[in-house]
Amino acid sequence: MAKKILYQDNARRALERGMEIMVEAVSVTLGPKGRNVVLEKPYGSPQIVNDGVTIAKEINLEDHIENTGVALIRQAASKTNDVAGDGTTTATVLAYAMVKEGLKNVTAGANPISIKLGMEKATQYLVTQINEFAQPVEDIQSIEQVASISAGNDNLIGSLIADALSKVGKEGVISLEEGKGIITELEITEGMKLEKGFISPYFITNTEKMEVSYENPFILLTDKRITLVQQDLLPILEQITKTKRPLLLIAEDVEKEALATLILNKLRGIVNVVAVRAPGFGELRKQMLEDIAVLTGGTVITQDAGLSLENIQVNLLGQARRIIVNKDSTTIVGDGLEIEQIKARCEQLRKQVNIADTGYEKEKLQDRIAKLSGGIAVIRVGAVTETEMKDKKLRLEDAINATRAAVEEGIVPGGGATLAHLAENLLTWAKINLKEDELIGAMIISRAIVAPLKRIAENAGINGPVIIEKVQQQEFEIGYNAAKNVFGNMYDEGIVDPAKVTRSGLQNATSIASMILTTECIIVDETD
């Protein structure tokens, strides 16, 4: 196929045009007065969303070169979403602001490589500043504030997530389910998260989230290596097929031939199955399988117990209300029938802790107790329509991710205030530590990082530059509350952002922007 080649300024300007189209669509959602975006779906009703990364994934332009710009800036949003789970709109707005500022200087003759170096040094300085100013999250109120802001200023969601975290702990699992009514409610149930994911991506049922999710599955637990399906699994698979229920297989390993047969059965719709390697090693693996068996009411198929895979019945399998498996972990949500057995098992493990010889043994036993007794918080999302349900689930996901990020690295003043204040500090630092084109790179960052605050103000119908100037004249904690159109202490107002979200958004935006500024040529397919 013939190729189209663009050089220098033409290449960079074409990328910028694509970025601008995408940023305009995404940034309308920013801030408390941000609007929604309607996405047309090839099937089903249109989706109304307020989530940056979801909008970014939908944008595909006709012009190949502009579309390359969209793909690059989408990367900043996706990477931020992977690391922090929130802050995707901020990352997108930052990346575009950096490119826009940077292109002016590159066009005027500044050296792009020196600019890139200056931008990277400036970002490194800002990251250390963000970490310095971050305040640890210690009370439920702070968690509630972070969750509310991330969910689009929804205090009900904020209190639900704070409640969930207080019950299952900071490391606990929070699972989202579609509720039956219109009220969103919280339920704590037995459950466990294993640090092992699916063996093959062909088991995936939800390609958007890249995960496997099954309701009411059977769970087959064995410490054996599955080599041939015909020999090891065929009898039990035939029994499960009759029940039309899915199967989670947890084994020491599944060899290639057996794995291929399982995948084929899944793809043909004969039996919905997902295979996961058992967690742990050696003796610990057997004990962890026993823990899962207690949680699910099943039996571990092991040689020691005189059981073999060929002649097992369905009554030896465990059961769960729901399982969610991704590439790194498996979450089993219990069905609530094994409460007494779980209590007894935890008691037994606590006795073992008291007589354990080594620190390592004690640590592993305590880890197992935490996994068994911690439980899982299930938030049942209620809504009047399916469209509202999808929007609520996206908001809840953002809020849960933001809350975890806040617990990890602390919180900073929200609403774009942190970056607006740091822009002043950065200028002072850069003038002392950098020179020539590197200084220009730092100044690009300094001018670009006020963009989120500017956009939040503009979405509220207020003049952005005026707000930026007023915020920068105040103390670090003072920012602009767009919901009430007042200035105040962001911690007192409850407008806080997780430091991790601000940091990763800034780093990813700089990474993408500096790559675009150092682009000299684009090669794309020629369209007819």
Curated annotation (Swiss-Prot):
<dbReference type="InterPro" id="IPR027409">
    <property type="entry name" value="GroEL-like_apical_dom_sf"/>
</dbReference>
<dbReference type="Pfam" id="PF00118">
    <property type="entry name" value="Cpn60_TCP1"/>
</dbReference>
<feature type="binding site">
    <location>
        <position position="497"/>
    </location>
    <ligand>
        <name>ATP</name>
    </ligand>
</feature>
<feature type="binding site">
    <location>
        <position position="415"/>
    </location>
    <ligand>
        <name>ATP</name>
    </ligand>
</feature>
<dbReference type="InterPro" id="IPR002423">
    <property type="entry name" value="Cpn60/GroEL/TCP-1"/>
</dbReference>
<comment type="function">
    <text>Together with its co-chaperonin GroES, plays an essential role in assisting protein folding. The GroEL-GroES system forms a nano-cage that allows encapsulation of the non-native substrate proteins and provides a physical environment optimized to promote and accelerate protein folding.</text>
</comment>
<dbReference type="InterPro" id="IPR027410">
    <property type="entry name" value="TCP-1-like_intermed_sf"/>
</dbReference>
<dbReference type="InterPro" id="IPR027413">
    <property type="entry name" value="GROEL-like_equatorial_sf"/>
</dbReference>
<keyword id="KW-0413">Isomerase</keyword>
<protein>
    <recommendedName>
        <fullName>Chaperonin GroEL, chloroplastic</fullName>
        <ecNumber>5.6.1.7</ecNumber>
    </recommendedName>
</protein>
<keyword id="KW-0067">ATP-binding</keyword>
<dbReference type="GO" id="GO:0051082">
    <property type="term" value="F:unfolded protein binding"/>
</dbReference>
<dbReference type="GO" id="GO:0005524">
    <property type="term" value="F:ATP binding"/>
</dbReference>
<keyword id="KW-0547">Nucleotide-binding</keyword>
<keyword id="KW-0143">Chaperone</keyword>
<keyword id="KW-0934">Plastid</keyword>
<dbReference type="GO" id="GO:0016853">
    <property type="term" value="F:isomerase activity"/>
</dbReference>
<dbReference type="InterPro" id="IPR001844">
    <property type="entry name" value="Cpn60/GroEL"/>
</dbReference>
<dbReference type="GO" id="GO:0140662">
    <property type="term" value="F:ATP-dependent protein folding chaperone"/>
</dbReference>
<dbReference type="GO" id="GO:0042026">
    <property type="term" value="P:protein refolding"/>
</dbReference>
<dbReference type="InterPro" id="IPR018370">
    <property type="entry name" value="Chaperonin_Cpn60_CS"/>
</dbReference>
<feature type="binding site">
    <location>
        <begin position="29"/>
        <end position="32"/>
    </location>
    <ligand>
        <name>ATP</name>
    </ligand>
</feature>
<dbReference type="GO" id="GO:0009507">
    <property type="term" value="C:chloroplast"/>
</dbReference>
<keyword id="KW-0150">Chloroplast</keyword>
<comment type="similarity">
    <text>Belongs to the chaperonin (HSP60) family.</text>
</comment>
<comment type="subunit">
    <text>Forms a cylinder of 14 subunits composed of two heptameric rings stacked back-to-back. Interacts with the co-chaperonin GroES.</text>
</comment>
<feature type="binding site">
    <location>
        <begin position="481"/>
        <end position="483"/>
    </location>
    <ligand>
        <name>ATP</name>
    </ligand>
</feature>
<feature type="binding site">
    <location>
        <begin position="86"/>
        <end position="90"/>
    </location>
    <ligand>
        <name>ATP</name>
    </ligand>
</feature>
